[in-house]
Structure formats: structure tokens, C-alpha cells
Amino acid sequence: FHPVQMRIESFQKLKELIASHSEPAVALGDFNLTNKDDKKFNVYKNQEDYWYVAHREGCSSCLGTYYYSRGKSWDFLDTIMVSRNRGVEFVNSSIDVYKTKFNTYKNTGKPNWFNSDTKQGVSDHFPFVAEITFN
């Protein structure tokens, strides 16, 4: 379990890093920030001075990259961010949660957790993809 404060501090560090230079930048990965915490603390909204956040720019029909069975809810625990106004941007139509028969559990639409015996599935999250252009 990772407290939301650790997430907020990580995003603050990203803001400090991007503010320290003027080069294009890309930040991506598993930020483990739930939609509930994002709404409560405006974490992604607070990044908008420096970053475009993929799931806020495109993928409007995407539910998320992770499904919480207990709460029956989807979250974007994973995302991709590109620096704002620095010659790098998303091709918004390319932003997507990557689902295939291989990484989706039966007909549920949920991630097929990786099975080390069969070598099938993904992690507990779906991959998140986007085409990025540099001008």
C-alpha cells in the first residue's frame, strides 16, 4: 500500500525537474494514483502548467488501466505525460489502453494477470500507449 502523499510528492518532484530546464520531456509509468485520490487532490490537474497527461488529452472511451474488483471501479494507475509547449505532443487519436485476447481475462474486459507458469497475460494493469511527436 502506498499513501497518496507519496504520489503527490513524486508529482511535485516531476514538476521541479521539468521546471529546471527547457528541453522536451516524457514521463511515463505506473504512478499508482487512483481516480478517487486524483479527484480529491487534483493531482493531474495540478500538473497542467508543465505537462499534458495522456488520459486527459485522449482516450475518452477508455475506462482505465487497472480494475479494482472490490470497488468495481477502473483507474488510470498508469499514464504518459509529455512536456507542455516544448515541441513534443501526443497524437491524441493514438492514446489508448492496449487490450488484446492475450492480455484480457476471458470475456470480462479486465486485465489477465500474468501467470509465470503459462507465461500468459500481463501485469495487473493493461498497457497504456500513445504516439508522441517531436517538432
Residue ranges with predicted function:
Residues 1-9, 71-72, 120:
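Soluble non-cytosolic domains of exported or imported proteins
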Residues 3-23:
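A long, amphipathic alpha-helix that forms part
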Residues 17-26, 33-135:
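Metal-dependent phosphoester-hydrolase catalytic domains
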